[in-house]
Amino acid sequence: MRIGIGIDVHPFAAGRKLVIGGVYIPGHDGLDGHSDADVLLHAISDALLGAAALGDIGLHFPNTSAEFKDIDSMILLKHVGKLLAEHGYAPVNVDAMLLLEAPKIAPYIQQMRQNIADALGLQVGDVAVKATTNEKLGYIGRKEGAEAHAVCLIQGK
C-alpha cells in the first residue's frame, strides 16, 4: 500500500465554464487554466501519481503542450489510472476536499463521486468529496479562486 497527496489551485475567470469533479456547474465563472482547470481532478491526479512515484500532472500533461489545451480533465484522470495499471498499481480509495466560498457544491458532490469512481474503476463508496469555505479569509474568502486537496491510497496488483 502507498499513499499520495495532491493539491491544486486555480483562479476564477470570466467567460469560462466551471467544471469540478467532471460536473458542469452553471451560473458561476469558471476556473482559469490550460486545461478545463478542474481543480478537484487535478489534485486527485497528482495524489495518484505521487503515490506511485510517477511525477505529477505537469510532467505528464504539460501546460506548454497544445495537446492539452482546454482538455477535459476526466480524460487526464483516466490516463493517470492507466499509468498506474501499467506500473502495477490500482487505486484503493480517494479522499478529497474542495475549498471555495461559492458556488455551493453540495448539490453536485454525489455526481462528482460517481464520475471519479467510474474513471478509476472504484466503487462510489471508495471516493469521498467534501467542500468547505475559507470563512471569507484569503483569496478563497475573496472568491478569487478555488483549491482542492486529495489523499489517495493505492496498492500493488
From Swiss-Prot:
Site positions for Transition state stabilizer: 34, 133
Cofactor note: Binds 1 divalent metal cation per subunit.
Keyword Metal-binding tagged: yes
Keyword Lyase: yes
Swiss-Prot/TrEMBL keywords: Isoprene biosynthesis, Lyase, Metal-binding
Class of the enzyme per the UniProt entry, highest EC level: lyase
Matching Gene3D superfamilies: 2-C-methyl-D-erythritol 2,4-cyclodiphosphate synthase
Catalytically driven reaction(s): 4-CDP-2-C-methyl-D-erythritol 2-phosphate = 2-C-methyl-D-erythritol 2,4-cyclic diphosphate + CMP
Associated pathway: Isoprenoid biosynthesis; isopentenyl diphosphate biosynthesis via DXP pathway; isopentenyl diphosphate from 1-deoxy-D-xylulose 5-phosphate: step 4/6
Residues where 4-CDP-2-C-methyl-D-erythritol 2-phosphate binds: 8-10, 34-35, 56-58, 132-135, 142
The protein's Enzyme Commission number: 4.6.1.12
Binding site for a divalent metal cation: 8, 10, 42
GO biological process: isopentenyl diphosphate biosynthetic process, methylerythritol 4-phosphate pathway; terpenoid biosynthetic process
Family that this chain belongs to: Belongs to the IspF family.
Function statement: Involved in the biosynthesis of isopentenyl diphosphate (IPP) and dimethylallyl diphosphate (DMAPP), two major building blocks of isoprenoid compounds. Catalyzes the conversion of 4-diphosphocytidyl-2-C-methyl-D-erythritol 2-phosphate (CDP-ME2P) to 2-C-methyl-D-erythritol 2,4-cyclodiphosphate (ME-CPP) with a corresponding release of cytidine 5-monophosphate (CMP).
Subunit structure: Homotrimer.
Protein name: 2-C-methyl-D-erythritol 2,4-cyclodiphosphate synthase
Organism, as annotated: Chlorobium chlorochromatii (strain CaD3)
